[in-house]
């Protein structure tokens, strides 16, 4: 390995961004590249563990003291994060150079495009990392270029636009930040600005794989120097080449592994409905009650992740009433759960990490998207990849229990479910092939490593 075979990786400070980028670090480390993973946090020692001696985890303050209450104003919060990184990252780079371990590239989260100028000002290559799929980034790009007008309603069903290599999209298929721009002005600006300087970026990385977005990728690659490196699911669930890569190594939440697995072990194959909406989605009380009723009425066993902050919304005596039919937990070991033989389908918010896990592990899905890129992911999950169905909300954006029961029956019992399971298995194989030796993502990771080794 030559001097300077070293890159810095800097994710946005949210678990949904840290997880795929830290997984990418493991793949790079397995190919003898030195990595400094910079985690922005208010803690002096972020709770991330790695078995790789070539991955060094370095914390950078987010501008807040540990335990200090963060501002609810996103503009203020991100200004402090940006200021803190700009003040501390240059010294970190200089110290690395003085220590004889100079970095040659900065891999940074797409939501922080200003880091490209920091990289270039210190002679580093700038590699932007998109934690969302191209199907979403392409939409944001057209908004940025002014070729698509932001609609004003979320629940309208009129056709709005057709993008290159994408299916026709309705209002309820678009990222929520576009349809509710007045509700999320800062976030809308952030997601659009991801593309603001992409034409100057040296390398474009994305947590997807070539076969998954094949048609769209032909157009994308004609515009930018793209390397798809996903799915960033731990190796032991895919190609099994990295024996130590059994989990994500980073979690903000405790997982009650034994409780979940013992309960699942007592169930028949493909008999359990697994329900999890990630770490950020908050259901209104009426919606949570409706979902609870739907799960109960479906007649199937179910494992439902209900965070502690949400449990007070459950119907009175619900836990006692469902008995052995259902298990509610505050968090679950999702990868272990999804690969358990008892799981029949995955009810998901369609966040990209969860969607990619479902695809990679061959699990049929029921999409119940809420915001961000979730509606667009759900559209592709149902209509393009055909690995699940999407619940339909009413005119008020409310999903009724009857609709939920109907969708569970489609996936778990109906003929449609057989075709969905067949497609899910197909994508599982393709995901494994992508990261296996000689696969498209493996080749792309090798190409990236060759630039700096």
Swiss-Prot record:
InterPro entries: UDP_glucos_trans, UDP_glycos_trans_CS. The keyword DNA damage does not apply. Transmembrane segments: none annotated. The keyword S-adenosyl-L-methionine does not apply. Belongs to the UDP-glycosyltransferase family. It comes from Arabidopsis thaliana (Mouse-ear cress). UDP-alpha-D-glucose binds at residues 279, 332-334, 349-357, 371-374. This is UDP-glycosyltransferase 74E1. It is an enzyme of class 2 (transferase). One of its GO terms (molecular function) is UDP-glucosyltransferase activity. Keywords: Glycosyltransferase, Transferase. Pfam families: UDPGT (PF00201). Its EC number is 2.4.1.-. It comes from the Eukaryota.
């Amino acid at each position: 390995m030559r001097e300077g075979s070293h890159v810095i990786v800097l994710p946005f400070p949210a678990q949904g961004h840290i997880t795929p980028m830290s997984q990418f670090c493991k793949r790079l480390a397995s190919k003898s590249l030195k990595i400094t993973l910079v985690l922005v946090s208010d803690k002096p020692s972020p709770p991330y563990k790695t078995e790789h001696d070539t991955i060094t985890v370095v914390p950078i303050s987010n501008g807040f003291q540990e335990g200090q209450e963060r501002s609810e104003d996103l503009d203020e919060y991100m200004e402090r994060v940006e200021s803190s990184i700009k003040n501390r990252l240059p010294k970190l780079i200089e110290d690395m150079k003085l220590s004889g371990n100079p970095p040659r590239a900065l891999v940074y989260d797409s939501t922080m495009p200003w880091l490209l100028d920091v990289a270039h000002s210190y002679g580093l290559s700038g590699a932007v990392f998109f934690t969302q799929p191209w199907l979403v980034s392409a939409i944001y790009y057209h908004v940025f270029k002014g070729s698509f007008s932001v609609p004003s309603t979320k629940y309208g069903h009129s056709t709005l636009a057709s993008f290159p290599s994408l299916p026709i999209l309705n209002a309820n298929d678009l990222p929520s930040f576009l349809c509710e721009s007045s509700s999320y002005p800062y976030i809308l600006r952030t997601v659009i600005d991801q593309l603001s300087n992409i034409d100057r970026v040296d390398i474009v990385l994305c947590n997807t794989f070539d076969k998954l977005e094949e048609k769209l990728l032909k157009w994308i690659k004609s515009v930018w120097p793209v390397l798809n490196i996903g799915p960033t699911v731990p190796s032991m669930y895919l190609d099994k080449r990295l024996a130590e890569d059994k989990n994500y190594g980073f979690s903000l939440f405790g997982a009650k592994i034994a409780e979940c697995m013992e309960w699942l072990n007592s169930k028949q194959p493909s008999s359990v409905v697994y329900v999890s909406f990630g770490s950020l989605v908050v259901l209104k009380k009426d919606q949570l009650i409706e979902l609870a009723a739907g799960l109960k009425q479906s007649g199937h066993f179910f494992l439902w992740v209900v965070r502690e902050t949400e449990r007070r919304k459950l119907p009175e005596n619900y836990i006692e009433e469902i008995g052995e039919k259902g298990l509610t937990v505050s968090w679950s070991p999702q990868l272990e759960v999804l690969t358990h033989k008892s799981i029949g389908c995955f009810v998901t918010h369609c966040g990209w990490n969860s969607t990619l896990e479902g695809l990679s592990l061959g699990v049929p899905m029921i999409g119940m998207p809420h915001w961000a890129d979730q509606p667009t992911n759900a559209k592709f999950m149902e209509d393009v990849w055909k690995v699940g169905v999407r619940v339909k909300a009413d005119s008020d954006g409310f999903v009724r229990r009857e609709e939920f029961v109907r969708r569970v029956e489609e996936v778990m019992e109906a003929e449609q479910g057989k075709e969905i399971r067949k497609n899910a298995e197909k994508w599982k194989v393709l995901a494994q092939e992508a990261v296996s030796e000689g696969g498209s993502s493996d080749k792309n990771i090798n190409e990236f490593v060759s630039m700096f080794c």
